[in-house]
C-alpha cells in the first residue's frame, strides 16, 4: 500500500516537472525574439541617414540617427489568435508599416515560424537623449485569457548611444 502512495506522489511531481519544463521551453521563443528585436532597434538606430538626398559641391549636411517609429499593429493583432495556440504570421503582418518605414518594417524584423506570442514595438521619441523604445511579447499559453508579458526596453543616452536593458521584464511568464 505504501508503495502505491509513493508511486502516486512521484507521478504527481513528475507531471508538475514536465509541465514546468514544457512551459519554459515555450517562453524561450519570447526571450529570443525580444533579444533579436532589441538588436534590430540598435542596428536601425546606428544606420545613419542624411537629411538631404543630394549635396552640392563644397556643402555638408547633418547625419541623423533615429529610432524606428512605433508599429501601428501587433503581430498578430489580437490576443485571441495566440490563446492556447500558435499563430503563423505572414510577411504582410510584419510589413504593415512599410509605406512609412516604421514599426517592424523599419526594424526589418520578422518571424517566419509559428509563434506562441503576440509582438509589439513602441518608440517614445526618435533621436534625443532620453527617447526610448519598448518591445513586448504577450502570450496565453494555456488559453485562459490571462496574458503573460515579456518586455525589453532601451533609451538613447547623452552620448547618443542606445542603452538596452540587461534583463527582460517578465510578468506571469508561464501563463
Language-model regions, residue ranges each:
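Acidic, glycine-anchored loop motifs typical of Ca2+
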Residues: 50, 140-147
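Short, glycine/small-hydrophobic-rich surface segments
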Residues: 41-109
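Membrane-proximal amphipathic alpha-helices
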Residues: 23-34
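Amphipathic alpha-helical segments that mediate coupling or scaffolding at interfaces
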Residues: 21-24, 44
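Low-complexity, S/T/G/P-rich flexible repeat/linker segments used as non-globular hinges
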Residues: 147-175
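Intrinsically disordered, low-complexity regions enriched in Pro/Ser/Thr/Gly and acidic residues
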Residues: 98-126
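N-terminal single-pass transmembrane signal-anchor helix
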Residues: 1-22
Amino acid at each position: 500500500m505504501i508503495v502505491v502512495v509513493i508511486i502516486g506522489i512521484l507521478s504527481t511531481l513528475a507531471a508538475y516537472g514536465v509541465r514546468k519544463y514544457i512551459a519554459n521551453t515555450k517562453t524561450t521563443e519570447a526571450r529570443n525574439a525580444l533579444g533579436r528585436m532589441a538588436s534590430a532597434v540598435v542596428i536601425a538606430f546606428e544606420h545613419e541617414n542624411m537629411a538631404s538626398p543630394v549635396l552640392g559641391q563644397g556643402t555638408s549636411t547633418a547625419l541623423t540617427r533615429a529610432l524606428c517609429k512605433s508599429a501601428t499593429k501587433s503581430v498578430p493583432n489580437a490576443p485571441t489568435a495566440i490563446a492556447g495556440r500558435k499563430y503563423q504570421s505572414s510577411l504582410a503582418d510584419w510589413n504593415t508599416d512599410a509605406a512609412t518605414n516604421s514599426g517592424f518594417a523599419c526594424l526589418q524584423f520578422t518571424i517566419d515560424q509559428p509563434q506562441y506570442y503576440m509582438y509589439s514595438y513602441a518608440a517614445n521619441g526618435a533621436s534625443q537623449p532620453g527617447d526610448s523604445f519598448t518591445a513586448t511579447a504577450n502570450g496565453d499559453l494555456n488559453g485562459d485569457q490571462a496574458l503573460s508579458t515579456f518586455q525589453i526596453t532601451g533609451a538613447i543616452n547623452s552620448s547618443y548611444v542606445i542603452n538596452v536593458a540587461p534583463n527582460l521584464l517578465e510578468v506571469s511568464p508561464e501563463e
